[in-house]
């Protein structure tokens, strides 16, 4: 509980351990109740279940991604009240504002999967709250003047009406202009280029 995994995610994860066909069933039935799954003793792993933390995290990300902003708010607030009272106070100070933040990228065919546990909600939302935000440092491998230059140019091109694709294309163009690779496939093929 203190780690912040949603109860529902832990249940889903355990089901993937118990029955080898549960994960395929869930993919085919993403909104169905797990009670609809036909559990079979024949599908139990004969070697016994092995704990897989990465799998638990993946299941949890998917479970949280299925929730709407109001559900995420309620469950994150419940967690924060017990384990992070300062963050709980920030959430409660303006619930509609918090829900609107949590609604960013939620829903649709490809919902964002930034949150793995309820513990992740504070750092995810911190930059929206003056009292929680801590400015980061530029990564040491990048020249601060170059990073600042990209950010200044970004401010000149920023348009809040841009959709995600237009916004991302602008970011790629600015970074390419500064000498960075704007194509992930090309970068993976030759990171030194």
Language-model features: locations:
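Catalytic adenosine-cofactor/nucleotide-binding cores of aminoacyl-tRNA synthetases and other
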Residues: 1-152, 156
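C-terminal accessory/binding modules appended to enzymatic or scaffolding proteins
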Residues: 145-193
